[in-house]
Amino acid sequence: MTTSGVRVRIAPSPTGEPHVGTAYIALFNYLFAKKHGGEFILRIEDTDATRSTPEFETKVLDALKWCGLEWKEGPDIGGPYGPYRQSDRKPIYQPYAQELLDKGHAFRCFCTPARLEQMREAQRAAGKPPKYDGLCLSLTAEEVTSRTAAGEASVIRMKIPPEGSCDFTDGVYGDVSIPWDSVDMQVLIKADGMPTYHMANVIDDHLMKITHVARGEEWLASVPKHILLYRYFGWDQPVFMHLSLMRNADKSKLSKRKNPTSISYYSALGYIPEALMNFLGLFFIQIAEGEELLTMDELSEKFDPDNLSKAGAIFDIQKLDWLNGRWIREKLSEEEFQARVLAWAMENDRLKAGLRLSQTRISKLGELPDLAGFLLKSDLGLQPSDFAKIKSPPEEILEILNTVQPDLEKILEWNVETIEAELRAISDRMGKKLKVVVSPLFVAVSGSPRSLPLFDSMAILGRSVVRQRLKLAAQAVAALVGAK
């Protein structure tokens, strides 16, 4: 693998809470650059204008900084190849799109969303994978000009070779061959003029002189589109490396439904960043048992990108807890430990919000742990007996928990008002009084039938923690139902 003049990047999309999977890919790129004396840069890929927000961008940057990752160039510090935010680069992409049209490598497509959906439904009914059928390929230049002048909306799609295969070597998967007839005529420029991921990704990587592209294995099937774009533009392509996805213990894809996936979840609960990076870094190295405790420099020394496994990296929270405990006990001096605790407490938004709610509800400071301690716990240790005191039967409690969990995911802005509104709506849909619905939620969220106000507590804890606690509560109640 060629490694001279290495430049790698992490390119997160600011469409939600920063994911541990982003930290996983970022760490690989960071270690790769560090190992080869190269440069690690950060680019924000916000071409999804409907879901990308400045707030999520800030959270992503803050989360990666908390992880201890430092980039040489990025939207927050600038650099010679900026802007480093794709929405700020929109004018850059248009000439390249026109170049593809002029060279006959792309075409305008006027198919409506309704027509495309009908096409996909017909393909699925015939047992075929959905992909564009090429209807607009036959349009003449005059027809395209006329329809465009009439104000008809269009996108720009790339042309795909009609036969043969795309053969390439991946840094992890080795030699790969993908038939061209399985590759879709990808949209490159959307109707609003914004590029899709595929178009912007290739252009930005070239202009930013990226030499190695390391990303999740879910992008492996997209490599033919990217290689084709490099060929169409006459550019040298980077080395591709597709990393195995992180998985749950049952080998399923890591998801927020089974494990907390937000970096902020681990930060707020008192995990230390060195331990999280240590844990993620173990997926990229080979060590003997007993050698697991490693600093970033030690991870870099042992890092070997030529011996990566295609097997899924198992995200074992128990192992993370074990490593975090070892870091606290073995790597931090007493003074540093105290400083970390104080800094964590002072910067902990949950604690601050909990103190504000608690001030009017206590008569002694010593009452705080019982009243608000649940805000800082990683595990409430819920037992089936904790729900036995609720008047509703276990079957009804389980129904409530199983209904509330997915419905809360519909909330776009997670705050007191939206949580209350959704829970009231759930109560109406279930035909139950609000008190009946929220009673088990008090126990699920705080571990007690009486605590700080429920809606405030849920807002303070955040979506990831509430999701996890409701899941564990449902498991506890299911055991109660099974015992009857």
Swiss-Prot record:
One of its GO terms (cellular component) is cytosol. It is found in: Cytoplasm. ATP binds at K256. A motif ('KMSKS' region) lies at residues 253-257. It is an enzyme of class 6 (ligase). Keywords: Aminoacyl-tRNA synthetase, ATP-binding, Cytoplasm, Ligase, Nucleotide-binding, Protein biosynthesis. GO terms for biological process: glutamyl-tRNA aminoacylation. Coiled coil: none annotated. A motif ('HIGH' region) lies at residues 12-22. Pfam families: Anticodon_2, tRNA-synt_1c. It comes from the Bacteria. Belongs to the class-I aminoacyl-tRNA synthetase family. Glutamate--tRNA ligase type 1 subfamily. This is Glutamate--tRNA ligase. It comes from Rhizobium etli (strain CIAT 652). The gene is gltX.
